[in-house]
From Swiss-Prot:
Enzyme class label: ligase
Organism annotation: Bacillus cytotoxicus (strain DSM 22905 / CIP 110041 / 391-98 / NVH 391-98)
GO BP, sorted A to Z: 'de novo' IMP biosynthetic process; cobalamin biosynthetic process
Enzyme Commission designation: 6.3.2.6
Name this protein carries in UniProt: Phosphoribosylaminoimidazole-succinocarboxamide synthase
InterPro entries reported in the protein's UniProt record: SAICAR_synt/ADE2_N, SAICAR_synt_PurC, SAICAR_synth, SAICAR_synthetase, SAICAR_synthetase_CS
Swiss-Prot/TrEMBL keywords: ATP-binding, Ligase, Nucleotide-binding, Purine biosynthesis
Keyword Ligase: yes
CDD domains in UniProt: SAICAR_synt_PurC
GO molecular function ontology, one term from the record: ATP binding
Family membership: Belongs to the SAICAR synthetase family.
Keyword Oxidoreductase found: no
UniProt xrefs under Pfam families: SAICAR_synt
Catalysed transformations (reactions): 5-amino-1-(5-phospho-D-ribosyl)imidazole-4-carboxylate + L-aspartate + ATP = (2S)-2-[5-amino-1-(5-phospho-beta-D-ribosyl)imidazole-4-carboxamido]succinate + ADP + phosphate + 2 H(+)
């Protein structure tokens, strides 16, 4: 499989065409961004860590029957994935009050929720990826009612699998963002990534943060935090 021309470059990844019409080549970048791109930095090794962690977690999800776009890891920073049409929604699942939910509800971070909350954000950088209701989603033609229901169900199932796996590593899954795509066959599958860039991950006992909040809030060394998550998951030798 060959990497051909660049199709798209985002904040954290580059996507390239391959000679296979139904596959694309993803390269993880060493860039870190926060606050819709207002804060930026280059952090050596971050691309490798996100690729390793995403590869590990996508394989875990595939093992329990959750379909993803992931095909195989190609190098320290690259993956081969199925080509999908991305649904323009970020699906955020929350288990504990933190981040924007804390500000929006005026509640302290760290309070566990009685049951997970699923939120939808419209993917539009110019609008700042706003929180949207199901009615808004229909007005935007971002997804059908049936697709919204499917996204919610998939997010909650993935949440349960990840909660259990991170708990076995002494990590609390506070919240996380997912993206989904539609294959050529019309199936909705998990796409994008699952990494400390897209999850809030706290130590089970100390609540030390091992995620992008380390960068957002200047809490320490980002690569050390991500390395800790990879180590607890089993390390690169298992990925």
């Amino acid at each position: 499989m060959q990497k051909l021309e660049l199709l798209y470059e985002g904040k954290a990844k580059r996507i390239y065409r391959t000679e296979a019409a139904d596959m694309v080549w993803i390269e993880y970048k060493d860039s870190a961004t926060a606050f819709n791109g207002e804060k930026k930095a280059t952090i050596t090794g971050k691309g490798r860590l996100n690729n390793e962690i995403t590869t590990f977690l996508f394989r875990k999800l595939q093992e329990v029957g959750i379909e993803t776009h992931f095909v195989k890891k190609l190098s320290d920073t690259e993956q081969l994935v199925k080509k999908v049409s991305i649904i323009p929604l970020e699906v955020v699942t929350r288990n504990v009050i933190a981040g924007s939910l804390s500000k929006r509800l005026g509640m302290e971070e760290g309070i566990p929720l009685a049951k997970p909350i699923v939120e939808f954000y419209y993917k539009d950088d110019d609008l700042g990826d706003p929180l949207v209701t199901e009615d808004h989603i229909r007005v935007l033609n971002a997804a059908t009612l049936e697709q919204i229901s499917t996204l919610r169900e998939k997010a909650l199932r993935i949440n349960q699998v990840l909660i259990e796996h991170f708990a076995s590593c002494r990590v609390r899954l506070i919240d996380f963002k997912l993206e989904f795509g539609i294959t050529e066959e019309g199936k909705i599958v998990l796409a994008d990534e699952i990494s400390p860039d897209t999850c809030r991950l706290w130590d089970e006992e100390s609540n030390e943060k091992f995620d992008k909040d380390v960068f957002r809030r200047d809490l320490g060394n980002l690569t050390e935090a991500y390395e800790e998550i990879l180590k607890r998951l089993g390390g690169a030798s298992h990925v």
